[in-house]
C-alpha cells in the first residue's frame, strides 16, 4: 500500500510540473518576479463556472474559471484586469 501511495504522489507531482512549467517558461519576468499579465489564461482544475477576466497581451478577455488552481492572470472584472495589466 505504501508503494501505491508513493507512486500516486509522484504521478500527481509530475502532472503538476507538466502543467506549471510551460506557463512559467512563457511568462515574462521583471525584477526577478513573474509578470502575471504575461501568463496564459488558465481555467484551473475544478468544474465550477465563474466568469473571470485575463490579460491576453493586448486587452482583457473574458474566460471561464473552474474555481480552483490556475494562475494569477485572473481578475473578477474587466476594470480590475485593465487597471493591473494595461500599459498607459
From Swiss-Prot:
Keyword Secreted set for record: yes
Residues of the BPTI/Kunitz inhibitor domain: 37-85
Residues flagged as site, May bind Kv1: 39
Site (Reactive bond for chymotrypsin): 47-48
Chief site of localization: secreted
GO terms under biological process: envenomation resulting in negative regulation of voltage-gated potassium channel activity in another organism
Superkingdom classification of source: Eukaryota
Residues cleaved off as propeptide: 28-33
Signal peptide (residue range): 1-27
GO molecular function (one): serine-type endopeptidase inhibitor activity
CDD domains linked to this entry: Kunitz_huwentoxin (cd22598)
PROSITE patterns noted in UniProt: BPTI_KUNITZ_2 (PS50279)
Keywords linked to the UniProt accession: Disulfide bond, Protease inhibitor, Secreted, Serine protease inhibitor, Signal
Any Pfam family: Kunitz_BPTI
GO CC annotation: extracellular region
Subcellular location(s) per record: Secreted
Free-text tissue specificity from the UniProt record: Expressed by the venom gland.
Family assignment from sequence similarity: Belongs to the venom Kunitz-type family. 03 (sub-Kunitz) subfamily.
Purpose of the protein: Serine protease inhibitor that inhibits trypsin at a molar ratio of 1:1.
Official protein name in the record: Kunitz-type U15-theraphotoxin-Hs1a
Species of origin: Cyriopagopus schmidti
Amino acid at each position: 500500500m505504501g508503494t501505491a501511495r508513493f507512486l500516486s504522489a509522484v504521478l500527481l507531482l509530475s502532472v503538476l510540473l507538466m502543467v506549471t512549467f510551460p506557463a512559467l517558461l512563457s511568462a515574462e519576468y521583471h525584477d526577478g518576479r513573474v509578470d502575471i499579465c504575461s501568463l496564459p489564461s488558465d481555467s484551473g482544475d475544478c468544474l465550477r463556472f465563474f466568469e473571470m477576466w485575463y490579460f491576453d497581451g493586448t486587452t482583457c478577455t473574458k474566460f471561464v474559471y473552474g474555481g480552483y488552481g490556475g494562475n494569477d492572470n485572473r481578475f473578477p472584472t474587466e476594470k480590475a484586469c485593465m487597471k493591473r495589466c494595461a500599459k498607459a
